[in-house]
């Protein structure tokens, strides 16, 4: 099951100069208005595969990771409509306040969301709040059904792609 959506909003063509930072995993860009974000469930890739991926350069690692995620490894908790709804409702909660959602898709073991970050909001804080809140909600939902994830709900980091207008 894939849950897709598009939320309309006023989109500015203005971009600001981005600032890069890293928590030691992946480099991230702040200050960029348009961002494509991907994050995955904690069990979406086996540990041995993740170790092999570190040997690849960034672009090849990203491509290989996307292919592996699309193969549907792990518990695929996001395939359940009630779990996918937690994710979507969470994104929509701050839409219009911290960011505009342009498009999203919830896959069985990972998500993609395209947003325009508002001035004064930090992408790292936005993603951290999404993952923190939804991890608690998903764990609660799973426990109500007698299920418990073997690994943390979410991976420790996320992929972001700064979208720029070069016209």
Give the role of each language-model region.
Residues 1-167:
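Short catalytic/metal-binding and nucleic-acid-binding patches
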């Amino acid at each position: 099951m894939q849950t897709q959506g598009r939320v309309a909003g006023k989109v500015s063509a203005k971009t600001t100069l981005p600032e890069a930072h890293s928590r030691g995993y992946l480099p991230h860009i702040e200050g960029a208005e348009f961002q494509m974000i991907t994050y995955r469930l904690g069990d979406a890739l086996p540990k041995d595969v993740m170790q092999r991926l570190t040997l690849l350069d960034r672009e090849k690692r990203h491509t290989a990771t996307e292919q592996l995620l699309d193969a549907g490894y792990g518990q695929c908790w996001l395939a359940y409509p009630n779990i996918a709804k937690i994710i979507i409702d969470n994104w929509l909660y701050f839409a219009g306040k911290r960011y505009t959602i342009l498009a999203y898709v919830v896959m069985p073991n990972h998500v993609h969301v395209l947003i325009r970050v508002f001035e004064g909001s930090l992408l790292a804080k936005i993603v951290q709040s999404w993952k923190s809140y939804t991890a608690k909600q998903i764990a609660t939902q799973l426990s109500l059904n007698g299920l418990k994830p073997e690994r943390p709900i979410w991976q420790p980091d996320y992929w972001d792609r700064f979208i720029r207008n070069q016209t």
